[in-house]
Amino acid sequence: MQSRKTRALGKGRARVTSCDDTCATATEMVPDAKDRILASVRDYHREQESPTFVAGSTPIRPSGAVLDEDDRVALVEAALELRIAAGGNARRFESEFARFFGLRKAHLVNSGSSANLLALSSLTSPKLGEARLRPGDEVITAAVGFPTTINPAVQNGLVPVFVDVELGTYNATPDRIKAAVTERTRAIMLAHTLGNPFAADEIAEIAKEHELFLVEDNCDAVGSTYRGRLTGTFGDLTTVSFYPAHHITSGEGGCVLTGSLELARIIESLRDWGRDCWCEPGVDNTCRKRFDYHLGTLPPGYDHKYTFSHVGYNLKTTDLQAALALSQLSKISAFGSARRRNWRRLREGLSGLPGLLLPVATPHSDPSWFGFAITISADAGFTRAALVNFLESRNIGTRLLFGGNITRHPAFEQVRYRIADALTNSDIVTDRTFWVGVYPGITDQMIDYVVESIAEFVAKSS
């Protein structure tokens, strides 16, 4: 018997053409003029000098975008062609990004947080029938993380169930997830912390056993693998962020991916105002029966383009952002290699220093690291605040592990949630953990300066 979840799833001058209701204005330009402009953009890019690293003076940021000549040209070219609404670049990126993961559909949105909102909201759609999530249903998640992994549950009237994380990997473990399941549990939503995969295969099996949806927050982990398989391919839905701090960037942006055509259709509807029509922007009557529908209590033949099947949002991105994302897409592998190299150099350099718990990769994983987490030991002769302040005084950027134990924040004082087990490690993370950067813009010289600075501080403080 099928489970309820399975059942659910111009020459001489520019000539501007008219702007349709998507405002995707197009320009016809003499090719030579466009080529000259783009050549000048390349010249301009090459004239920009990369600053020489000066220890203690040049900032070492924990994260950032790495943009090259092709990225700059892609943005300018899209601007020249006045691609201002989501269009051809967006569709092409969605197709290529879905192919990268081996999934059927990808939908670009305006942020990773919006991607999380859409992913979980889609599971509440009436179109899923008895499988849909309803107010009061429970969603298991980790207590440590970024709030927008958790907020969509609250925003949909669901109940977050918090489990503790493991020190070192900073992920929730399968045994904790399994112990948290009750008759009210309907979904699991977890992030791969700082690019380090959670045990996705085992947790996916728990979800399957209990007929639960699994949503992977893959915002910090594009290119990471678990048991040889890309993170983001284990769940029913996966989300990605393209904010400049992340593995590739579109400036602002995000994406929801799925292997389910039914969920993809719901995602698209929720993203695009909740409308029932699936036409691309600027396109009408794809279904060839635009005025033949009779839905709800609307009069027969009501325009399908203005028929709404969900209480949705407008979370689309623009073609300029998609142009940058497309240019960045081919760099995922190189960026991942740089992140891994920087992480290893830090790990080797800091190994053996007293008072520091260094990060470890989840067994069977190959993380494309987002950051390098350090936890101060209980018996260290110094505090996190002292070390962080010392590093910041040397222009070495630091970050806490996002929200730490999210239940300790003012925003959650009036939120209904359940704690599945003691959040001991989550509190340790809140009190004693921080991270430094490994993104591709950090050089070996910078990594060595970070290592030297931490070693100097520990030697003086221990």
UniProtKB/Swiss-Prot annotation:
Pfam families: DegT_DnrJ_EryC1. It catalyses: dTDP-4-dehydro-2,6-dideoxy-alpha-D-glucose + 2 reduced [2Fe-2S]-[ferredoxin] + 2 H(+) = dTDP-4-dehydro-2,3,6-trideoxy-alpha-D-hexopyranose + 2 oxidized [2Fe-2S]-[ferredoxin] + H2O. Optimum temperature is 37 degrees Celsius. GO terms for molecular function: lyase activity; pyridoxal phosphate binding; transaminase activity. It is an enzyme of class 4 (lyase). InterPro entries: DegT/StrS_aminotransferase, PyrdxlP-dep_Trfase, PyrdxlP-dep_Trfase_major, PyrdxlP-dep_Trfase_small. Pyridoxal 5'-phosphate binds at G112, S113, D220, S241, N314. The keyword Lyase applies. Coiled coil: none annotated. CDD domains: AHBA_syn (cd00616). Its EC number is 4.2.1.164. Optimum pH is 7.5. The keyword Lyase applies. It comes from the Bacteria. Homodimer. PANTHER family: DTDP-4-AMINO-4,6-DIDEOXYGALACTOSE TRANSAMINASE, TRANSAMINASE. This is dTDP-4-dehydro-2,6-dideoxy-D-glucose 3-dehydratase. It comes from Saccharopolyspora spinosa. The lineage of its organism: Bacteria, Bacillati, Actinomycetota, Actinomycetes, Pseudonocardiales.
